[in-house]
């Protein structure tokens, strides 16, 4: 466990969170007064991007937390 790079894991987690926030903001920007099907589809696609970014952020968080648990608790 001595070779685990906690700074890198934390950095990966923070980048993933930033990407998730950016995806949320992009989705939010598409919620507008244009009620056309095209705009709705763009909004839906942005929602899928939010879902994907959330999944990546949670995986990065889990990798970081798992490494910390192994270091601090031995499991």
Model segments located where?
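Short, charge/polar-rich alpha-helical segments
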Residues: 1-18, 47-48
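Short E/K-rich amphipathic alpha-helical oligomerization segments
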Residues: 17-48
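Short amphipathic alpha-helical coiled-coil/interface segments
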Residues: 13, 43-57
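Short alpha-helical scaffold segments that flank and stabilize functional sites
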Residues: 19, 26, 49, 56, ...
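Long amphipathic alpha-helical coiled-coil segments
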Residues: 31-42, 58-75
